[in-house]
């Protein structure tokens, strides 16, 4: 199925060579696992029918925003509130660093005394705990919110409360809140497209492949999976999906799933995982089976980079959470300054493999900071 995609900052491994979530049980057969994933995905899709950041027409890259709107004026003593998913995942810890260092940089440039307060749950299933964190920030009176929801629905009521209090809300990656004022994050559908293209190139466009999916409730999991499948279909690829199953963003579940698939599918050549944590679990299963299987993840966490250097993980689609946070912070400040922002700002991402794993991230994505000025 061909889909119109909002173009973010996208760098593929091929271009570089030329110049960081269903059932948790192992299935009895690949067919059964495919049927299970299909049903859970279909049940979850309705929550984002109203808004899809990957296809939203009112969208720009951060470079396009800067070209159109210019410098960012920063008022004194602003407080931005950021609520993330689990701090046990390196992706979210890196996002936190991006928020905090963005504030430091902006204060150095402007003397504005900007504060970004970051909170996160201890695991990726505590939907109620995450909601409480957002409510606390609303009651505290933050000037804007940057939210990365666990699911597409757990923060809906909190977003409405924030809007009632005239607090603008940025939905930052992962779960999609249809009622949020704005969205900033990587194009999840493109994650899957990049992975499928890279695997196809490595395998000569033929071979059995499998997909380890995150949580069925998560927008990113569904979009990454669909992007992977659509690339295969749209390009009449010889890649053959023989198994797919949710592992709920859990490394051990992904490892167990992969171990079963390797036994059931002796011709399995590649496994695409919706995030790096699951991919690293799959790498363990592949090593233990002494199999020759490509493993591709998503997120670009440090452990994934290390595994690529060591010859374990084959590739990751780096969504650069550090720079996602810096983009989101910039966007929130632009809104507070009264600038007319697009509904969606696409953040940088790139495929990382052995060819570019040691290149500087800022160089890969061509990163520069915005110009910030004091009010």
Where are these regions (language model features)?
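Generic cytosolic/nucleocytoplasmic N-terminal low-complexity/intrinsically disordered segments
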Residues: 1-3, 33-34
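Sec-dependent N-terminal signal peptides of Gram-positive bacterial secreted proteins and lipoproteins
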Residues: 2-24
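A residue-level marker of the well-folded mature domains of exported/periplasmic proteins
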Residues: 14, 21-375
């Amino acid at each position: 199925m061909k889909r119109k995609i909002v173009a973010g900052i996208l760098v593929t491994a091929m271009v570089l060579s030329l110049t960081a979530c269903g059932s948790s049980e192992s299935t009895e057969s690949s067919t059964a696992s495919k049927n299970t994933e299909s049903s859970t995905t279909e049940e979850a899709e309705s929550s984002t029918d109203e808004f899809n950041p990957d296809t939203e027409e009112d969208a720009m890259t951060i470079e396009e925003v800067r070209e159109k709107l210019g410098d960012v004026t920063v008022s004194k003593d602003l407080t931005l509130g950021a609520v993330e998913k689990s701090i046990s995942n390196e992706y979210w810890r890196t996002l936190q660093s991006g928020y905090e260092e963005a504030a430091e940089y902006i204060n150095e440039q402007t003397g504005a005394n900007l504060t970004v307060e970051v909170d996160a749950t201890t695991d990726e299933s505590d939907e109620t705990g995450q909601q409480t964190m957002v409510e606390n920030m609303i009651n505290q009176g933050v000037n804007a919110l940057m939210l990365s929801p666990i699911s597409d629905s757990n923060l809906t009521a909190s977003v409405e409360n924030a809007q009632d209090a005239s607090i603008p809300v940025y939905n930052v990656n992962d779960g999609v809140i249809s009622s949020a004022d704005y969205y900033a994050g990587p194009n999840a559908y493109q994650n899957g497209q990049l992975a499928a293209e890279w695997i196809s190139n490595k395998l000569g466009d033929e071979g059995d492949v499998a997909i380890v999916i995150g949580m069925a409730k998560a927008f990113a999991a569904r979009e990454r999976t669909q992007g992977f499948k659509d690339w295969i279909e749209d390009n009449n690829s010889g890649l053959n999906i023989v198994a797919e199953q949710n592992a709920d963003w859990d490394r051990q579940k992904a490892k167990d799933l992969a171990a079963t698939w390797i036994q059931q599918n002796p011709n399995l050549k590649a496994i695409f995982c919706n995030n790096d944590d699951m991919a690293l679990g799959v790498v363990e299963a592949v090593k233990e089976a002494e199999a020759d299987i490509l493993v591709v993840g998503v997120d670009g966490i440090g452990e994934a980079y290390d595994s690529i250097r060591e010859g374990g993980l084959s590739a990751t689609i780096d969504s650069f959470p550090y720079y996602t946070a810096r983009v989101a912070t910039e966007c929130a400040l632009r809104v507070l300054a009264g600038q007319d922002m697009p509904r969606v700002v696409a953040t940088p991402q790139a495929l990382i493999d052995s060819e570019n794993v040691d290149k500087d991230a800022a160089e890969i994505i061509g990163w520069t900071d915005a110009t910030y000025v004091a009010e």
